[in-house]
Amino acid sequence: MKALYTLIPAIALATLSADALAQSQEMIPPELATRFVGKDGMVCGKVEKAKYAQSSEGEPTFLYMGGMFPRHTFSARIDGANRGKFSFAPETLEGKDVCVIGKIQRDASRAEIEVSSPSSLKLATIK
Protein backbone atom coordinates (compact mmCIF):
# COMPACT_ATOMS: atom_id res chain seq x y z
CA MET A 1 0.00 0.00 0.00
CA LYS A 2 2.87 2.36 0.79
CA ALA A 3 4.21 1.92 -2.76
CA LEU A 4 0.85 3.06 -4.12
CA TYR A 5 1.06 6.34 -2.21
CA THR A 6 4.46 7.12 -3.70
CA LEU A 7 3.20 6.28 -7.19
CA ILE A 8 0.18 8.61 -7.07
CA PRO A 9 2.19 11.88 -7.06
CA ALA A 10 4.28 10.63 -9.99
CA ILE A 11 1.12 9.85 -11.97
CA ALA A 12 -0.34 13.25 -11.10
CA LEU A 13 2.81 15.01 -12.31
CA ALA A 14 2.86 13.01 -15.52
CA THR A 15 -0.70 14.07 -16.35
CA LEU A 16 -0.15 17.81 -15.90
CA SER A 17 -1.06 19.74 -19.02
CA ALA A 18 1.32 22.25 -20.59
CA ASP A 19 -0.98 25.04 -19.37
CA ALA A 20 -0.83 23.84 -15.77
CA LEU A 21 2.93 23.47 -16.01
CA ALA A 22 3.25 26.99 -17.42
CA GLN A 23 1.13 28.40 -14.61
CA SER A 24 3.33 26.71 -12.03
CA GLN A 25 6.57 28.06 -13.52
CA GLU A 26 8.12 31.28 -12.36
CA MET A 27 7.97 34.14 -14.83
CA ILE A 28 11.45 35.09 -16.03
CA PRO A 29 11.88 38.71 -17.18
CA PRO A 30 13.53 38.98 -20.63
CA GLU A 31 16.46 40.86 -19.10
CA LEU A 32 17.31 37.85 -16.89
CA ALA A 33 16.70 35.06 -19.43
CA THR A 34 20.41 34.56 -20.20
CA ARG A 35 20.84 33.30 -16.62
CA PHE A 36 18.59 30.35 -17.49
CA VAL A 37 20.24 29.20 -20.74
CA GLY A 38 20.00 25.43 -21.09
CA LYS A 39 16.91 25.19 -18.89
CA ASP A 40 13.20 25.06 -19.59
CA GLY A 41 11.51 28.28 -18.56
CA MET A 42 8.77 30.81 -19.11
CA VAL A 43 10.01 34.21 -20.25
CA CYS A 44 7.38 36.95 -19.93
CA GLY A 45 7.44 40.53 -21.13
CA LYS A 46 6.24 43.02 -23.70
CA VAL A 47 6.90 42.22 -27.36
CA GLU A 48 8.73 45.44 -28.26
CA LYS A 49 9.10 44.53 -31.94
CA ALA A 50 7.91 41.65 -34.11
CA LYS A 51 9.34 40.83 -37.52
CA TYR A 52 8.44 38.27 -40.17
CA ALA A 53 11.73 37.81 -42.04
CA GLN A 54 10.33 36.39 -45.28
CA SER A 55 13.54 36.97 -47.22
CA SER A 56 15.74 35.22 -44.62
CA GLU A 57 16.60 31.52 -44.69
CA GLY A 58 13.80 29.53 -43.06
CA GLU A 59 11.46 32.56 -43.17
CA PRO A 60 11.48 33.01 -39.38
CA THR A 61 9.32 35.31 -37.30
CA PHE A 62 11.02 37.04 -34.38
CA LEU A 63 9.34 38.44 -31.29
CA TYR A 64 11.84 40.78 -29.62
CA MET A 65 11.49 41.42 -25.88
CA GLY A 66 13.53 43.24 -23.27
CA GLY A 67 14.22 46.28 -25.44
CA MET A 68 13.90 47.33 -29.06
CA PHE A 69 15.80 45.49 -31.78
CA PRO A 70 18.81 45.38 -32.00
CA ARG A 71 19.28 46.10 -28.30
CA HIS A 72 16.79 43.47 -27.12
CA THR A 73 17.76 40.91 -24.48
CA PHE A 74 15.47 38.06 -25.56
CA SER A 75 13.77 36.77 -28.69
CA ALA A 76 11.20 34.12 -29.49
CA ARG A 77 11.95 32.57 -32.88
CA ILE A 78 9.20 30.90 -34.92
CA ASP A 79 10.52 28.98 -37.91
CA GLY A 80 8.65 29.59 -41.15
CA ALA A 81 7.67 25.91 -41.29
CA ASN A 82 5.78 26.38 -38.00
CA ARG A 83 3.88 29.57 -38.95
CA GLY A 84 1.06 27.51 -40.45
CA LYS A 85 0.30 26.08 -37.00
CA PHE A 86 -0.83 29.53 -35.84
CA SER A 87 -4.39 30.75 -36.47
CA PHE A 88 -3.04 34.33 -36.50
CA ALA A 89 0.06 36.10 -37.76
CA PRO A 90 2.53 35.95 -34.83
CA GLU A 91 3.82 39.46 -35.61
CA THR A 92 0.42 40.80 -34.47
CA LEU A 93 1.68 40.18 -30.92
CA GLU A 94 3.80 43.35 -31.16
CA GLY A 95 2.98 45.64 -28.24
CA LYS A 96 1.36 42.85 -26.21
CA ASP A 97 2.53 41.17 -23.00
CA VAL A 98 3.40 37.56 -23.80
CA CYS A 99 4.90 34.54 -22.04
CA VAL A 100 7.10 32.24 -24.12
CA ILE A 101 7.51 28.70 -22.81
CA GLY A 102 10.34 26.37 -23.79
CA LYS A 103 14.04 25.60 -23.60
CA ILE A 104 16.06 28.79 -23.25
CA GLN A 105 19.02 28.88 -25.61
CA ARG A 106 21.77 31.37 -26.32
CA ASP A 107 21.77 33.42 -29.51
CA ALA A 108 24.89 35.61 -29.63
CA SER A 109 24.78 37.57 -26.35
CA ARG A 110 21.02 37.14 -25.96
CA ALA A 111 18.60 34.43 -24.90
CA GLU A 112 16.15 32.81 -27.28
CA ILE A 113 13.37 30.23 -27.27
CA GLU A 114 12.54 28.37 -30.48
CA VAL A 115 8.73 28.28 -30.65
CA SER A 116 7.37 25.28 -32.52
CA SER A 117 3.68 25.46 -31.60
CA PRO A 118 1.08 28.03 -30.50
CA SER A 119 0.87 26.36 -27.07
CA SER A 120 4.33 27.80 -26.32
CA LEU A 121 2.97 31.38 -26.48
CA LYS A 122 0.52 32.81 -23.95
CA LEU A 123 -0.91 36.30 -23.62
CA ALA A 124 -0.01 37.61 -20.18
CA THR A 125 -1.07 40.20 -17.67
CA ILE A 126 2.16 41.61 -16.27
CA LYS A 127 2.06 44.11 -13.42
What are these regions (language model features)?
Residues 1-8:
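Bacterial N-terminal signal peptides that target proteins for export
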Residues 8-15:
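Bacterial N-terminal signal peptides
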Residues 23-127:
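OB-fold single-stranded nucleic acid-binding module
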